[in-house]
């Protein structure tokens, strides 16, 4: 009798729950040994990885996959190098598990503190990019969590080949294979099962398009770490240094167009707009960026600037398109960001400390920056070593989610025969 998708996912979940208890108590040396052995296995399996990936690429082309998705799917030699190096870098990161902080004696005589512990079982749902298999598996393993990985059907062969290397690493370290499991079925019902198993899965991390994340957020019966959009802003204050403003606004938009930390709307104080917008517009036009602006922006820069609509202020373009709005003051800038932004990353360019501090305090986003490009909103750039994603939620993890974001804390209490009176 053929196993149903629900039965299959239940079997994976039960195995992951059991494995989570073993990986939670694994030593740092044991976890690092698994990571380094997996890196060696990847290095030794380049031909197998390439062959599996070529099969996925051929299937993708036959199914009419868009060029951008085919590019994400491809495991080039450089990307395999990056995966190998990524495993080795995670092995070098400090192990957060078991760390005790804030120990203090209380009047009763007991000593109370907090210990960092794994979350348990983490389900990762992602699309296209097989390198996410390594990112997710390595961070979950190092943070003492078991993980169930459900990649896109278009990358199934690549993910299987990568998972085989991870399994070799686990075996070398004498850790159970169930610490990292890849969902083998391409049936979409597997996603529905994974996100509705609170008895086996402690948290879900979806990485992919907006429709996937919306579905997971709507239907999940376990907590979700996510972000929906990256509608990021740069506000150029009246007290901005012109050179800094131009450099930051250029980089925030044109460094790369697709990432979620790319600026989508530029806000400029009316008192500085005539000095900063014309040179910026020239840079954007030279780089092929389509400009959409408010009435004052169009009056200043010319009719070739498309009239911005209400929808533009809400839009994450992930393309060479930029919305520009001239605002009367800091209050209007903050109000605009808190109304139309996605609570991801927003920046102010200003030499005025009180304006910058107000922006820092009042903009309700996961990352708020002063005189820096929004492109810095990244786990590696924040010194986390790696990230599993970026969260715009306020509970548990917020911003780039690295090792610590995949852990929780429990209270630990030390006594010496103490009883409560």
Curated annotation (Swiss-Prot):
The main location is: cytoplasm
SUPFAM superfamilies hit by this protein:
ALDH-like (SSF53720)
Q: Which PANTHER family match?
A: DELTA-1-PYRROLINE-5-CARBOXYLATE SYNTHASE, GLUTAMATE SEMIALDEHYDE DEHYDROGENASE
- EC numbers listed for it are 1.2.1.41
A GO term from the CC aspect: cytoplasm
What is its pathway? Answer: Amino-acid biosynthesis; L-proline biosynthesis; L-glutamate 5-semialdehyde from L-glutamate: step 2/2
One Pfam family it belongs to: Aldedh
| Species this chain originates from | Pseudomonas fluorescens (strain SBW25)
- Catalytic function, reaction form: L-glutamate 5-semialdehyde + phosphate + NADP(+) = L-glutamyl 5-phosphate + NADPH + H(+)
Domain of life of the source:
Bacteria
PROSITE patterns in alphabetical order: PROA
InterPro entries assigned to the protein according to its UniProt record, in alphabetical order: Ald_DH/histidinol_DH, Ald_DH_C, Ald_DH_N, Aldehyde_DH_dom, G-glutamylP_reductase_CS, Glu-5-SA_DH, GPR_dom
Identify this protein by name: Gamma-glutamyl phosphate reductase
Q: Which family does it belong to?
A: Belongs to the gamma-glutamyl phosphate reductase family.
In UniProt terms, what function does this protein have? Catalyzes the NADPH-dependent reduction of L-glutamate 5-phosphate into L-glutamate 5-semialdehyde and phosphate. The product spontaneously undergoes cyclization to form 1-pyrroline-5-carboxylate.
